[in-house]
A protein has these predicted regions:
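Second-shell loop/turn segments in exported
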Residues: 60-70, 91-106, 172-176, 200-210, ...
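Soluble metallo-hydrolase cores and metallopeptidase-like ectodomains found primarily
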Residues: 152-187, 242-316, 327-330, 334-335, ...
C-alpha cells in the first residue's frame, strides 16, 4: 500500500510541475513562471499540404515518354472545370454544380469540345440525349426549437429524387434511431415524425450503413413523415445523397449540425423541427456526350471516357477523371497516326447522375458500336487526398487514396493493367471489384474494360474541391493509362477478351 501511495504522489507532483504549479510547505499551490530553461522544447511544426509536398513516384527509367503527362498541367483542367460549378453557385442556385441538363452542364461540354478541336481530334461532335423528367430541389430549410432555443441547420441538403414537403412545410417531432437497425426501431413510435439516422460511411455518400442495413426504407415503412440522415464524418460537410427512403421528404445533414440537434433533443423537452422543401419537376431537358477521335491504322478502336456532370464543385467527381481523359487526348494527339494501331475514341459521357444515358447507349448498341472495341477505359474519381478520422477531426495526409479497380478481360489484360499501376505508383485495393461501379457499370461487360475509382469522404460533398485532388495522383493515373494503351496496342483483340467460361 505504501508503494502505491508513493507512486501516486510522484505522479501528482509531476502533473503539477507540468502545469506550472508547485505546492509550498504551507500546502498552498503557487504558480511558477516558466523561464526559457523550463519551457517545453516542443514546437508545433506543420507539413505543407500542397501539390509540391505530396508523395510522388519518380519516373522509372525507360518510361520517359510518359513524362509529358504532368500533374500540374492536368490539374489546370480540374480548376477550369470546377470553375463552372462555382459559377453555378455564385449565380444563386441552391442546388448547384454541373447538374445534368442545365446550362452549366452545357458549358462543361463546350470546354471538352473546344479542347478536342484544339488537340486536332477528328469527328468532334455532340451526341444528344433526352433526359427523363428531373426532380430538382429549388428551396429548402430546417430549424429545430426547444427549451427556448432555436437553431438553424444550415447543412441540410435534399436527397436526390426526394419528395417535396407539403405547401407551408412541416413541423415534426424528431425521433433519434441511431443506426436505424431493427433493434433501434424496436419500441419506438415514428409515425408522423422526423426520423433521425446516424449512418456509418463505408466509405462515403454512395455506400453507407443507412442504405445497406435498410434504415431508410425501415423509417418510411413505419410511417415516418420525413427522414434526416447524417454520415459520421468529422466536420460539417454538406452531402448530396441518394437516401431512397420512400415517398417522403428526405435530407442529409452535416455532423456538427447533427450534434447540435441531438444535444437540443437531449436537453429540451418537446423539441420540434420545422422543415420546408420545394421541388420542381422539369421535363424537356437534354444532355450530350462529347466525342472526338484520333484515327488509327485498323478498324479496331479503344474508348476512353469520363462523365462531366457533378454535384457541388465536383473536383474528384469527376473533374479529376475529365482531366486525365483530356490529358490522354492531348498526349496521343502528338503520336503520328501511323504509330496508332487502333482508333482512339474519347468521350465525355452525358448524364451520369441522370441515368448514365451515354454509357447505356453504348451498351444498347454493343452489337455494332463495340464489335471492334479492344479496350474501354473509364476515368472516374481518380485522385483524392487520403484522410483519417481522428477524434472530431478529419485529418489529411500527404498521400493519394487507394482506388478500387476493375478488369473485364483476359489474364493478360489484367497483368498489363496491374503492371502499369505498379510502375507509376498507383495505389489500389487488394481485391478486384466484383462489379464495375460508376459510369462504367452499364457497359463494363460489353467489351474488354478497365477502371480505377474511389468514392471516399469528400465524394458528393461541398468539400469536393480543387485542393483535395492531388496533382501527383492525376499524373500517376494518366501515365498508367497511357502505358496500358500502348501495351494493349501490341496485343490482338482475341487475346484481350475474357476466356470462355469453363476454359482453362
Amino acid at each position: 500500500m505504501t508503494g502505491v501511495k508513493w507512486t501516486f504522489g510522484i505522479v501528482a507532483v509531476a502533473a503539477t510541475l507540468l502545469a506550472g504549479v508547485v505546492v509550498s510547505s504551507s500546502g498552498r499551490a503557487e504558480v511558477v513562471q516558466e523561464t526559457p530553461s523550463t519551457q517545453s522544447p516542443v514546437t508545433k511544426h506543420t507539413y505543407p499540404l500542397d501539390d509540391a509536398h505530396y508523395l510522388r513516384w519518380a519516373l522509372p527509367k525507360g518510361e520517359e515518354a510518359y513524362g509529358r503527362l504532368e500533374g500540374e498541367r492536368l490539374k489546370r483542367w480540374v480548376d477550369t472545370i470546377t470553375a463552372v460549378s462555382r459559377k453555378s453557385r455564385d449565380d444563386g442556385n441552391r442546388f448547384w454544380g454541373r447538374i445534368a441538363g442545365t446550362k452549366y452542364d452545357e458549358m462543361t461540354e463546350q470546354i471538352v469540345e473546344d479542347a478536342f478541336r484544339q488537340f486536332g481530334l477528328q469527328n468532334v461532335r455532340r451526341q444528344w440525349f433526352d433526359l427523363p423528367p428531373q426532380r430538382l430541389p429549388t428551396a429548402w430549410s430546417m430549424t429545430a426549437s426547444g427549451g427556448g432555443k432555436t437553431i438553424e441547420l444550415t447543412t441540410v441538403q435534399p436527397a436526390r429524387e426526394s419528395a417535396a414537403a407539403p405547401h407551408g412545410g412541416l413541423e415534426l417531432e424528431p425521433v433519434w434511431v441511431g443506426l436505424g437497425t431493427e433493434s433501434d426501431f424496436k419500441g419506438r413510435d415514428v409515425k408522423g415524425k422526423l426520423v433521425v439516422i446516424q449512418s456509418v460511411p463505408t466509405p462515403g455518400a454512395i455506400n453507407n450503413s443507412a442504405g445497406w442495413n435498410g434504415a431508410n426504407m425501415r423509417a418510411s415503412e413505419r410511417g415516418a413523415a420525413a427522414l434526416l440522415v447524417s454520415l459520421a464524418v468529422p466536420g460539417n460537410l454538406q452531402y448530396q445523397m441518394w437516401v431512397r427512403g420512400g415517398p417522403i421528404p428526405s435530407f442529409s445533414i452535416g455532423t456538427d449540425d447533427l450534434t447540435s440537434l441531438r444535444e437540443l433533443m437531449e436537453k429540451a423537452s418537446n423539441v420540434k423541427v420545422k422543415l420546408q422543401l420545394d421541388v420542381e419537376e422539369r421535363s424537356g431537358l437534354r444532355d450530350a456526350s462529347v466525342w472526338g477521335e484520333l484515327p488509327g491504322t485498323s478498324d479496331e478502336d479503344i474508348i476512353i471516357m469520363a462523365h462531366h456532370d457533378a454535384y457541388f464543385e465536383g473536383a474528384l467527381d469527376n473533374a479529376s477523371g475529365m482531366s486525365v481523359m483530356l490529358g490522354l487526348a492531348e498526349y496521343f494527339s502528338k503520336i503520328p497516326q501511323a504509330q496508332r494501331r487502333r482508333t482512339i475514341k474519347f468521350v465525355s459521357t452525358s448524364g451520369h447522375h441522370a441515368g448514365s444515358l451515354g454509357t447505356k447507349w453504348m451498351s444498347d448498341n454493343k452489337a455494332t458500336f463495340l464489335a471492334r472495341t479492344a479496350l474501354m477505359i473509364n476515368c472516374e474519381h481518380v485522385s483524392v487526398t487520403q484522410t483519417y478520422p481522428w477524434g472530431a477531426q478529419l485529418r489529411k495526409s500527404n498521400q493519394v487514396d487507394a482506388r478500387r479497380w476493375w478488369v473485364f478481360g483476359s489474364q493478360r489484360l489484367a497483368e498489363v493493367a496491374l503492371d502499369a499501376y505498379r510502375t507509376f505508383g498507383v495505389a489500389v485495393y487488394h481485391e478486384m471489384e466484383p462489379n464495375a461501379s460508376g459510369d462504367m457499370g452499364h457497359v463494363s461487360r460489353d467489351a474488354p474494360s478497365i477502371q480505377m475509382i474511389e468514392s471516399p469522404n469528400f465524394y458528393h460533398s461541398d468539400h469536393d474541391r480543387l485542393e483535395v485532388v492531388p496533382a501527383a495522383g492525376l499524373e500517376a493515373v494518366a501515365r498508367a493509362y497511357a502505358k496500358i494503351v500502348d501495351q494493349v496496342n501490341r496485343i490482338d483483340r482475341k487475346d484481350l477478351v475474357p476466356a470462355p467460361r469453363g476454359s482453362n
